[in-house]
């Protein structure tokens, strides 16, 4: 199971500390399940999509800010075409103000992480790992026949400790 945390930075020399903080916040035991990817707004959409596709994540999270939101919106439209079974999560200041509205606008998005990112991300990651363990899936998890229903059951915004309870709302 691979959860890809993705940052689209304003410049090549900039880095996104949020994704590093999220990975550090899950602790050493869970860090092997988290991969980081950084791109810039100056890269082409095709180049970014190729970089994501090469990593083949089961789940991808985007760190959304005012400087990258337009490009992320384009990625959200194209990503399901190349990785149809990859679940998509959003987080960051550009998306947390209207989670339900964004979920209606982008039905391909599984959920929006709100609240304390480190707490919320850890809970989301733990939930995916519990599901994989319950399903008896190895690290190279085969897709189950009910993936579409599992996504529908979990879709929604999440906040802090209530993340598992709130899967399925919206």
Predicted segments — roles?
Residues 2-11:
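Nucleotide-activated donor-dependent transferases that construct or modify glycoconjugates
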Residues 1-3, 26-33:
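N-terminal subdomain of nucleotide-sugar transferases
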Residues 18, 22-25, 33-170:
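Glycine-rich beta-alpha loop elements in corrinoid/cobalamin-binding modules
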Residues 12-18:
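Short N-terminal binding/cap micro-motifs at the start of the first secondary-structure element
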Residues 11-12, 65:
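Short acidic-aromatic active-site loops that bind/stabilize oxyanions
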């Amino acid at each position: 199971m691979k959860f890809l945390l993705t940052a689209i930075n304003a410049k090549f020399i900039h880095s996104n500390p949020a994704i590093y903080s999220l990975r550090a916040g899950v602790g050493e035991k869970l860090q092997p399940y988290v991969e980081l990817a950084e791109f810039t707004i100056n890269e082409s959409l095709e180049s970014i999509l190729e970089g994501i596709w090469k990593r083949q994540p089961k789940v991808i999270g985007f760190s959304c800010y005012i400087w990258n939101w337009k490009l992320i919106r384009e990625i959200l439209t194209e990503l399901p075409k190349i990785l149809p079974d990859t679940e998509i999560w959003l987080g960051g200041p550009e998306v947390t103000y209207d989670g339900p509205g964004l979920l209606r606008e982008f039905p391909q998005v599984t959920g929006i992480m709100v609240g304390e990112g480190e707490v919320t991300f850890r809970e989301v990651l733990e939930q995916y790992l519990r599901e994989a363990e319950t399903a008896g899936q190895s690290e190279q998890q085969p897709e189950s026949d009910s993936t579409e229903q599992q996504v529908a059951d979990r879709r929604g915004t999440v906040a802090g400790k209530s993340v598992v309870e709130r899967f399925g709302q919206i």
